[in-house]
């Protein structure tokens, strides 16, 4: 399945949640697109579970096959499956770049990582799905620091709260991973138990 690259606002309206964060177009019309968008549709249990899974996929920009692999990995962990799934998604490098305020959206963060702007523990990494670990150090590469995206990030630092499990240091925009997040530290409008129920059928 190809990655969705269409209008994000339309997808947000279809799933009933702001997938970007601060999407003014969605806030103006938070109902599904199309002629009958305002019509009430009776939610079946399956539809609710599917919709929650799709919300998670599009929030983090993950394709179906990869999302299923994340779920299967979460099942093998000792904690609650839904919470473990969210921890895996949060530990992706593109999400960490977004959470640290170095990109306005996860889609932009994915592009920055893909274009080779970051190193992890001194090693160049250009894979958005790369999984960070506790005590990792993520740096913007020297030749990228003065490019427009990172200049904007420095100017807008503080506009969005940074989660307590990571820290951004000074003008170099270095990201320190103090720990991997607990569920209470993950602010996403998702009911992960519905995703577990979807895959448990």
Curated annotation (Swiss-Prot):
Any Pfam family: Ribosomal_S4
Job description of the protein: One of the primary rRNA binding proteins, it binds directly to 16S rRNA where it nucleates assembly of the body of the 30S subunit.
GO MF term set: rRNA binding; structural constituent of ribosome
Keywords: Ribonucleoprotein, Ribosomal protein, RNA-binding, rRNA-binding
InterPro entries registered for this protein in UniProt: Ribosomal_uS4, Ribosomal_uS4_bac-type, Ribosomal_uS4_CS, Ribosomal_uS4_N, S4_RNA-bd, S4_RNA-bd_sf
Organism: Mycobacterium ulcerans (strain Agy99)
Domain S4 RNA-binding: 91-157
Protein name: Small ribosomal subunit protein uS4
């Amino acid at each position: 399945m190809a990655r969705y690259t269409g209008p994000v606002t339309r997808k947000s309206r279809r799933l009933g949640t702001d997938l970007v964060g601060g999407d003014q177009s969605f806030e103006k019309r938070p109902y599904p697109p199309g002629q009958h968008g305002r019509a009430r549709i009776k939610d079946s249990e399956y539809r609710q579970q599917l919709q929650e899974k799709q919300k998670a996929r599009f929030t983090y920009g993950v394709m179906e096959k990869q999302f299923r692999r994340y779920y299967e990995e979460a099942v093998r962990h000792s904690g609650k499956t839904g919470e473990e799934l969210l921890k895996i998604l949060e530990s992706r490098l593109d999400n960490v770049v977004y959470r640290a305020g170095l990109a306005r959206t996860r889609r932009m963060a994915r592009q920055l990582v893909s274009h080779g702007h970051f190193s992890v523990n001194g090693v160049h990494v250009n894979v958005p799905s790369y999984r960070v670990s506790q005590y990792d150090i993520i740096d913007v590469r020297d030749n990228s620091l003065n490019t427009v995206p990172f200049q904007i990030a420095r100017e807008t630092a503080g506009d969005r709260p940074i989660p307590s499990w990571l820290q951004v240091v000074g003008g170099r925009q270095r990201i320190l991973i103090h720990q991997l997040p607990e569920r209470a530290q993950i602010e996403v409008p998702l009911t992960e138990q519905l995703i577990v129920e979807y895959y448990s059928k």
